[in-house]
Amino acid sequence: MRQPGIAYFDLNGLKKINDLQGHQAGDALIRRTAECILQAFGKKAYRIDGDEFIVIDRESGREAFHACVENALRAMEESHIAISCGISWRAERGNIDEQINEADKKMYLAKRDFYACKEHDRRHYWPEQE
């Protein structure tokens, strides 16, 4: 079975939006984020926590998967959504749990960098940046 591409997304600054603008604004942000991810990936995307989303793509090749990630990130950037993203792609080794953990770790690295360097609206890590 082909190993999937995994993309793990997490909103940056949702708590601040909820605190300053109210939970309706935060909910609207979550819905818009979901729309951007769904437009790029369709039924391969899942909301797994309040402001976290995961994509499990077993169908696309590496280049097409990366293009979908870029499309989702671009749509969020155009909507002024600050997001952290980590991805994992393994064509032949590992299992899906390892891939999800790898993507999750990369997402947290991106989130750490976002908060360390706030002039950036979003950051993401590709597997090649290890």
Where are these regions (language model features)?
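Conserved long alpha-helical elements within nucleotide-processing catalytic cores of c-di-GMP signaling
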Residues: 1-6, 12-39, 46-50, 54-55, ...
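Alpha-helix N-cap recognition
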Residues: 13, 61, 92-96
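Short beta-strand-to-loop capping motifs
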Residues: 55-60, 89-91
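Catalytic-core segments of nucleotide cyclases and related cyclic-nucleotide turnover enzymes
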Residues: 66-74, 88-120, 128-130
